[in-house]
Curated annotation (Swiss-Prot):
Stated name of the protein: tRNA pseudouridine synthase D
Active site per the UniProt annotation: 80 (nucleophile)
InterPro entries from the UniProt entry: PsdUridine_synth_cat_dom_sf, PsdUridine_synth_TruD, PsdUridine_synth_TruD_CS, PsdUridine_synth_TruD_insert, TruD_catalytic, TruD_insert_sf, TruD_pseudoU_synthase
Catalysis performed (reactions): uridine(13) in tRNA = pseudouridine(13) in tRNA
Positions contributing to substrate binding: 27, 129, 329
Enzyme class: isomerase
SUPFAM superfamilies assigned: Pseudouridine synthase
EC number in record: 5.4.99.27
Disulfide-bonded cysteines: none
The organism of origin for this protein: Salmonella choleraesuis (strain SC-B67)
UniProt keywords, alphabetically: Isomerase, tRNA processing
Length: 349
């Protein structure tokens, strides 16, 4: 398995270094649900501003305040403790009376708005996230400027970030240990983290191998293509390749890579053979996913940051603003710009 730091760069390895997240205010994330609350229903959606609190901690505190079980509070995604984040939490509170959320007091946390909603907010049920990042101590402004323009036009590899694998790769190591034993994992969080790490590592490996090809973004027979911004895909046939290539070049369609697991991967013929060969050596992780019946899926190979803009505060400090679809990693964008000083595996997704 290729180490995360050695995965193929789309625009070559950055020439300079820089510091990501010198303080929480350097990493601002605002969730974009993609819908507005219904205004009625047994659930309450709350938009919360937090700094110095992780998502699970806030959810547990909210459950205690409402005198409900912790499982009755849900969220669309984990947000980092050491960042300034706006995210939505959902609490199941049947009844017409709205709780007085002005009485909810938690250091570093503020309820910005709330409304009733008919459905539970489930993990992954958001459109995307808007990011404002500040990179400091940049050693090569010219290289970063060139890379920003290249990323705006050509995107970055849609790798799962280092944080998916845990500090020091602990989640991936846990998956490997589990795969080599028959012992059940009863801790649901560990089980989820380890399976996600296993599948993410295999995806990264497939993308890494494809990006090594000069014609990596050339549609091949059997590729699984995705409409930009959509989750479903269809299979390319040899007769359609010229037209499909035009649509890929115009970013209307995205070439996807496999999230391996049980069931069909989605690709066929030449594309399927390539993906299978790319991870042929990773039999342990593949066997784990099959054993645990993790369903195979697809994910876009490239990531195009939307609304990307930047502002140089001085020659060594730049502020970035961009929007990413749910499930994508801001750190994968930063990876294409600078060699980051320090380990950012602790940054939540």
């Amino acid at each position: 398995m290729t180490e995360f730091d050695n995965l193929t760069w789309l625009h070559g390895k950055p020439q300079g270094s820089g510091l990501l997240k010198a303080n929480p205010e350097d990493f601002v994330v605002v969730e974009d649900l993609g819908f507005t609350p219904d205004g009625e229903g047994e659930h309450i959606l709350l938009r919360i501003l937090k700094n110095g609190c992780n998502t699970r901690f806030v959810a547990d505190a909210l459950a205690k305040f409402l005198k409900i079980h912790a499982r009755e509070v849900s969220f669309a995604g984990q947000k980092d403790k050491h960042a300034v984040t706006e995210q939505w939490l959902c609490a199941r509170v049947p009844g017409k009376e709205m709780p007085d959320f002005s009485a909810f007091q938690l250091e570093g946390c503020k309820v910005l708005e709330y409304a009733r909603h008919k459905r539970k907010l489930r993990l992954g049920a958001l459109k995307g996230n808007a990011f404002t990042l500040v990179l400091r101590e940049i050693s090569d402004r010219r290289d970063v400027e060139t890379r920003l323009q290249a990323i705006r036009d050509g995107g970055v590899p849609n790798y799962f970030g280092a944080q998916r694998f845990g500090i020091g790769g602990s989640n991936l190591q846990g998956a490997l240990r589990w795969a080599q034993s028959n012992a059940p994992v009863r801790d649901r969080n560990k089980r989820s983290f380890w399976l996600s790490a296993a599948r993410s590592a295999l995806f990264n490996q497939i993308v890494h191998q494809r990006l090594k090809k000069p014609d990596f973004n050339q549609v091949v027979d059997g590729d699984a293509l995705q409409l930009a911004g959509r989750g479903s895909w269809f299979v390319a046939t040899s007769e359609e390749l010229p037209e499909l290539q035009r649509r890929v070049d115009e970013k209307e369609l995205m070439i996807t890579a496999s999230l391996p697991g049980s069931g069909e991967w989605g690709t066929q013929r030449a594309a399927l053979a390539f993906e299978q060969d790319a991870i042929a050596q990773e039999t342990v992780l593949q066997s784990l996913l099959l054993r645990e019946k993790v369903e195979a899926s697809r994910r876009a190979m490239l990531l195009y940051p939307q609304q990307l803009s930047w502002n140089w505060w001085d020659d060594v400090t730049v502020e970035l603003r961009f929007w990413l679809p749910a499930g994508s990693f801001a750190t994968s964008v930063v990876r294409g710009l600078i060699n980051t000083m320090g380990d950012y595996a602790h940054i939540a997704e």
